[in-house]
């Protein structure tokens, strides 16, 4: 997948995140994985071109606006705190995601949502 495609997919995901956006834990985690790959590119020796960095920043702002912070990573996945996107969940969840998350309990034993 090219850098442009990776960023476009993250951008598309954050644009579609409307209240009640239908997604499953698996689909949501897959999208968060896109952001992780972008972060790996951002940490590389060659910075992202300015126009791509702006798209990522705009997408990140949309994602933050449509989500709420968690004290543990989304759905019990393992992630470093620097991967802030893993520590957020949609503010308004569709029924499939809500049901999926109700079944997931993080290692600390407290429900995520």
Regions found by a protein language model. Give the residues of each.
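Short terminal alpha-helical segments
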Residues: 1-26
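Low-complexity, intrinsically disordered short peptide segments enriched in small/polar/basic residues
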Residues: 4, 53, 101-102
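Positively charged, low-complexity intrinsically disordered regions
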Residues: 17, 36-38, 89, 108
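Short, solvent-exposed secondary-structure capping/transition elements
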Residues: 22, 43, 47-54
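Amphipathic, non-membrane alpha-helical rod segments
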Residues: 26-45
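Short, charged, amphipathic alpha-helical segments
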Residues: 27-32, 50-57
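Amphipathic alpha-helical coiled-coil segments
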Residues: 39-48, 65-70
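Amphipathic alpha-helical binding modules
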Residues: 57-113
């Amino acid at each position: 997948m090219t850098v442009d495609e990776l960023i476009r997919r993250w951008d598309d995901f954050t644009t579609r995140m409307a209240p009640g956006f239908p997604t499953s834990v698996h689909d949501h985690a897959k999208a968060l994985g896109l952001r992780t790959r972008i972060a790996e590119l951002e940490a590389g020796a060659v910075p992202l071109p300015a126009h791509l960095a702006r798209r990522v920043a705009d997408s990140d702002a949309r994602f933050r606006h449509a989500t709420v912070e968690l004290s543990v990573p989304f759905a019990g996945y393992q992630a470093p705190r620097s991967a802030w996107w893993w520590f957020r969940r949609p503010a308004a969840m569709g029924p499939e995601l809500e049901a999926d998350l109700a079944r997931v309990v993080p290692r600390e034993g407290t429900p995520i949502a």
